[in-house]
Amino acid sequence: MLFGDKGYVKFNYDEQIVKWADCAREKGSEILANPGQLEEWLQCEGTWFVGVDVLPNDSSGGFDEVKLPCIFSKFLDKINLKPYHKAQLSVIYPGYPRPRLGDSKSAFEYRLKRDAAHVDGLLPVGAQKRRYLIEPHGVILGVPLNNTHPGASPIVVWKGSHRIMQQE
């Protein structure tokens, strides 16, 4: 199985990844300087820029200046998910997590106790806001664009969660 028992793959340091991340960070900084983008995507009392599909990558995952790193494209070619959509730029600011507009008390407590987590693709439906797998993701490629301290959680993946999602 491509993701093994863990459900994720950790890639080693690669200079192409650094170049791609540097380019993405520059583009991200331009996006974050745009008041219209902030108005659309800033959530949780100004502590989370959600930024779904805001990075201007092409359908192959690259930018005009730099292609998607080979180590990623070779791996992703095994899954055959092309064309790729625009990348999300998720930025956490000091004070996160704060309640998101419309969050119930239990939803906010979940975020507070679970590494500020949500499960991509699991969306609340109806008045009860029961969660269903509405937007299944073939893969999530998480690339940090800045240095974080050792206790930070730029991306959290629960070991074996891919098996749970397959059952749903």
Can you describe what each PLM-predicted range is?
Residues M1-Y13, K19, C23:
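Fe(II)/2-oxoglutarate
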Residues F3, A21-E168:
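Non-heme Fe(II) oxygenase catalytic core, chiefly the N-lobe of the double-stranded beta-helix
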